[in-house]
Amino acid sequence: MSERTKPAPHGWLLLDKPRGLGSTQAVGLVKRVLRQGGYAKTKVGHGGTLDPLAEGVLPIALGEATKLAGRMLDASKVYDFTIRFGEQTDTLDTEGEVVATSDHIPSLEDIAATLPAFTGPIRQAPPAYSAIKIDGKRAYDLARAGEDVEMKLRDTTIHALEIMEGAAQAVTLRAHVSKGTYIRSLARDIALALGSRGHVTYLRRIKAGPFLQEQAISLDSAEEIAKGAPLEHLLLPLEAGLDDIPVLHLDPDSAQAVRQGRVLSEL
């Protein structure tokens, strides 16, 4: 390592990913700014894919934090999203072609009355335009090739679902969901349950595991790393990725028992 090379960083860089940028592209951007900023080479990965059309919290793991990235994939997430009623697209968002329409636009009262049916354990069919593999091929590749893609139902959990704002032909909801939940599918199914059709026009992740959108930095701030801005002002510590794990305080005897692999009978 040369005198000018800075030590490899370890921790979390929390990006506020803009719409249009893929998660893999975001990882590439962080690798570049670290290299240009003079940091030693280190592992970089993300803690949960965020679709290019979505925006918001994207945890980027650096160095030793990459060992915790898998846990972040399993963490619950919170999203704000807007459903526009009247049209369903093949991609279930604004990028696709309209495949079904409805003249029925549900009222806010009807929407509110329907949401409890989508709270708790549910089953949903993922979008055909998704990265799920079917017989070794990505579903979106099959869909783009014009093949009829049959998506199997999956179990997921919606911990909370609430209305944030209503507008003409649209509603914005906030959903706290378990891993593996597809917001586009949730929007489709809510619209269908209301006797309408719908697709997502806005999607923002506001929380991923313990990480909040208030902690996230813009791409402009990340780019400053390449120009010599201190990384330590932006980097969250390794343990920040564990902040949502329940803590159990033990007395010295119980702590010693745990270290020895013994079961604590009083718990």
Task: Name each model-derived stretch.
Residues 1-53, 170, 193-267:
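Accessory RNA 3′-end/elbow-binding domains used by RNA modification enzymes
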Residues 32, 40, 55, 59, ...:
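The conserved catalytic core of RNA pseudouridine synthases
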Residues 43-73, 141-144:
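Glycine/acidic-rich beta-strand-loop module
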Residues 60, 81, 136, 186, ...:
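Residue-level signal for inorganic ion chemistry
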Residues 70-85, 149-163:
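Structural signature of FAD isoalloxazine-binding scaffolds in flavoprotein oxidoreductases
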Residues 71-124:
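Acidic, low-complexity central loop/insert segments
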Residues 130, 134-153, 158-159:
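Extended alpha-helical targeting/anchoring segments
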